[in-house]
Amino acid sequence: IFLEDESRAIGSLSIPKTFHDRMSRSPMAMLEESLQTRVDTIYTDYIYSNFQDFVSREASSAHEEFSNFLLNSLQRIQRRLGGEKYLQICSIMKQALQEGYQQNQEEAEALHKQWIKQLLQGYYDPMYEYQMNKKSSRIIYRGSKEELLSWASHLNPKEV
């Protein structure tokens, strides 16, 4: 079984302590993708798909509700981002949402990807790097999605 390395708390939910304790002692495989691939994946999964979910629930208020959802999510990490980074990313996010509202999808997508890239480089990547340095002794494999899938397909569960 492969699981994403998570903290015990995930939003308002939490992983059972015994399960999380076992996860924290288990070997790790690192999925390594380019920055652009990660930006594209996050855009598709968290922006495009989430917006479609908002539209399917209530089309007339989807833009406003989705905008509030994104801006509130960013606000929750404002203190950790720092004032300047927060304001810069928030400004780009608001521009992206406005372009989407005006049906300028190409510009909206480019702006969303711009703030996603800044958030990855300025916040998430340094945080993950710090966490992975603490867990480096447990890492048994690193590779791209294709490499990782190939490696995993040849594993003998008794060896891991």
Locations of regions flagged by a protein language model:
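Conserved nucleotide-sensing/catalytic segment adjacent to the nucleotide-binding pocket
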Residues: 1-16
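Conserved NTP phosphate-binding and transfer environment spanning the P-loop NTPase/kinase superfamily
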Residues: 21-160
